[in-house]
Amino acid sequence: MIKKVSLMTALSVTAFSGWAQDSADSLVVTANRFEQPANTVLAPTSVVTREDIERWQSTTVLDVMRRLPGVDTAQNGGMGQASSLFVRGTNSSHVLILVDGIRLNQAGVTGSSDLSQFPISLVQRIEYIRGPRSAVYGSDAIGGVVNIITTRAKDGTTLNAGVGSHGYQNYGGSTQQTLGDNTRVTLAGDYTYTKGFDVVADGNNGGLAQTDRDGYMNKTIYGALEHAFSDQWSGFVRGFGYSNRTAYDAYYSSFTPDVLVDTRQLYSQTWDTGLRFNDGIFHSQLLSSYSHSKDYNYDPHLGRYDSTATLDEIKQYNVQWTNSVDVGHGNVGAGVDWQKQSTEPGTNYVTNDTNLRNTGVYLTALQKFGDFTLEGAARSDDNSQFGRHGTWQSSAAWEFIEGYRFIASYGTAYKAPNLGQLYGFYGNDHLNPEESKQWEGAFEGLTAGVSWRVSAYRNDVDNLIDFDSNLQQYYNVGKARIKGVEATASFDTGPLTHTVGYDYVDARNAATNELLDRRAKQQVKYQLDTQVYDFDWSLTYHYLGTRYDTDFGSYPYQKVKMGGVSLWDLAVSYPVTSHLTVRGKIANLFDKDYETVYGYETAGREYTLSGSYTF
């Protein structure tokens, strides 16, 4: 019989903070790839459910992520525009993005995943862990790991529709049904469109500003089948795909003065299948996946197959075998994962048919000894380009008073060079991985009904890959030093639920001592939720501190300072019946004018009205 929660169906997490479940009875698996009680998780971790997304009425994944501790975001305008996700001051390429535990196939050439392109309709759960995790997951996990779960929590059918500012429209539906006692089927589809707005404020892309609207359209389809062969054995097959078209502001090139490449078309499809075994203290899963993405940039008057168009095309193959066994008051896990990324001839920046292969073997362990909890992980990766690379991490927690813990951790992590840096026009196939060493200390507890956590961390990143304009090639030349403090708390006052977060991040270039671009030094985040006469209210406050960026519209390029801003969102929902719910939201309530990327406008005040029917 299919269980409501399958151990290896999807990686799930919890946290000792207000952005996550804090039940000591919850079981989680993300932190170390094995099942463990939530109160033994030593890394700072957050989880967002589908109910949270609907309460916040978020229309993009980026809007969800910006609310979480340690996260800073930057975007070249509105929905669908290019974006960056910074976790604890690290580069956007230093965050590992997983979908159902599998690496998102979007970073093969550019090196980082753009979450503005991932459809929020696919998201049923987001699980987010901060700090180094390369010893568990391999490359990219320097700043943290974001795992997007697409599996619905329960059976049912949902139809939804919404409209809003800038011509926003959304229509979708999903259903999950159990057939007999052993088979479950899920189907979903979604369509999103917005006319958008003119994103460039002053031509910071190096040319004259385009006075046009920069819209976005997405079409998504999803299907999954799960079957339990016995009480111990089960299997699944799952597939999804999406097509995105985004208009953005570009500039006329001196080489092609009659061509304006200002449209992006992304096609992505993913298929995966797996077999699970769960028998008491031993758990195992064998999983394989295939994904294929084609990312065009072109002049819409000439088409995406014109010689002036560019293409990033990546195929990705994954095989994972994970195992865990309960031992004493803890668990031991071990596994192997294999990945191959390949490009087709003609792919942007990469002129030849190339591929990268990586095989990783890892070991994890957690054990509780009285008031002490110890965990550790070690991993060895064998990469076809740069050979072997090892990482490790360890953490220890001491519950010095009941309900209060001190946690100390240290870990190493790395980021492998991407295909563009290795094999592109300016590539260097002698590049080494970027490497990180991180320390963190934290106190957490429950005081007078307030669940809180305060942590301080330092992250030294060496061998950063940068482009040398004189030599016209990529080299391992950069270094970054990041120091920060993170504090979260959650509590109730009568019918009001409060969640508060504060982030201080000092992220600097170690050679020049300059602050890294687009990272706010301070952020304050506050979430208030309540119910009044069956109306569910959600009020969000976000203070985004001053940041620095580069003005590419000047020569030579100059650093510019972007001022801080206070943003308020208000969302309300009302259950008309037990099946029908209507929702409304005002984002940027006071219509603040600000930028997260210099020279690119944000949306201003926006309104959305939506409804869902569930049966």
Swiss-Prot record:
Start and end residues of each TBDR beta-barrel domain: 154-615
Short motif TonB C-terminal box, span: 598-615
Keywords: Calcium, Cell outer membrane, Ion transport, Membrane, Metal-binding, Porin, Signal, TonB box, Transmembrane, Transmembrane beta strand, Transport
Localization annotation: Cell outer membrane
Membrane topology note: Multi-pass membrane protein
Annotated Pfam families: Plug, TonB_dep_Rec_b-barrel
Binding-site list for cyanocob(III)alamin: 84, 91, 109-110, 250, 310, 518
NCBIfam families: PRK10641.1, TonB-B12
Official protein name in the record: Vitamin B12 transporter BtuB
